[in-house]
Swiss-Prot record:
It comes from Rattus norvegicus (Rat). GO terms for cellular component: extracellular space. Keywords: Protease inhibitor, Serine protease inhibitor. Pfam families: Serpin. Signal peptide: none annotated. GO terms for molecular function: serine-type endopeptidase inhibitor activity. PANTHER family: SERINE PROTEASE INHIBITOR A3A-RELATED (PTHR11461:SF195), SERINE PROTEASE INHIBITOR, SERPIN (PTHR11461). SMART domains: SERPIN. The keyword Nucleus does not apply. The keyword Cell membrane does not apply. GO terms for biological process: response to cytokine. This is Serine protease inhibitor 2.1.
Amino acid sequence: LVLVNYLLFKGKWKVPFNPNDTFESEFYLDEKRSVKVPMMKIKEVTTPYVRDEELSCSVLELKYTGNASALFILPDQGKMQQVESSLQPETLKKWKDSLIPSIINDLRMPKFSISTDYSLEKEVLPELGIKKVFSQQADLSRITGTKDLYVSQVVHKAVLDVAETGTEATAATGVATVIRRQPRTLNFNQPFMVFITDMDSQSILFVAKITNPS
């Protein structure tokens, strides 16, 4: 018996990108290599932002219609490992609490789609104490009608698509004042991370590290 978990989240940006403005641009994998990707862009967008000088990264929040938001973390060139090693619940809370509505004069972000499959029966679930269901001693008769079945595999599939109108992922209404007005450009043309969260519960729905969006 194989159990499959497929979680679906569909979000539309509160402020969408215009597909007509998407263009081909370089995404730098490292200091020597780059790939061509479709790059979305939007000008003069007001959105929560903070610069973390201690960790050498920029943090941007884009909100969806409804109660979800995406937190994009853009480390400076060569600083990804430093940011990753510092990622703790306290770090995310600090960023969230420090976000200030800001005008981004030029925001550029690649379209990307990533997909990952996880097998949970070997390590994750047994570490949680779920073991018997994977052995011949399992009794699934109350849900299957037979005692001869046991679970051989548990698969979790996660898919994340980010495009102009919003996000498809498987696995306050506005800003009254703008505090930061100095010109600011954000170009996600190098590896970055994204956290999709539920704003009501502050639960993290999806986490992804984008190293090659092509």
